[in-house]
């Protein structure tokens, strides 16, 4: 079940480009759509429902998650309409489609998905996270495609290939472990200079 975060004004474009209604009808996957901004929750639900999808929102699930919600299990698509739960969403997903990388928005932090063992499929626009995106791609933790249509097909191929999916998930975990401590290492390197400044040096 791929995860497809949808960002900003591109929500409608993404939903249409992915043919979510057709794919959901074929039970090929269940999209979990996570808008970046709360004010887009209702709009994204309306867009999905306009394509004939039955939508279940995270806020309606019990604390245990969708597995204990009949509504969620019967839905064609899930909508992540809560804040601070990306780890939950990535944990539920088989593959992450980074919505912000399919338009010139600069991409998203893919280390969070990788740390959850969720393979990443990203588009061409990752200039805000260029180094991380290039490293993840080189290490097999992320796959880059030209557009969202290709992204959905790449995600489906991974979902249908358990060995490739497991390999990508392990690569993501290893990539995240190597890169998670970057801030701490930077602060440690700067500490002598900060100490000198505080001492008036």
Map each language-model feature to its residues:
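Nucleotide-activated sugar donor-binding and catalytic core shared by glycosyltransferases
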Residues: 1-201
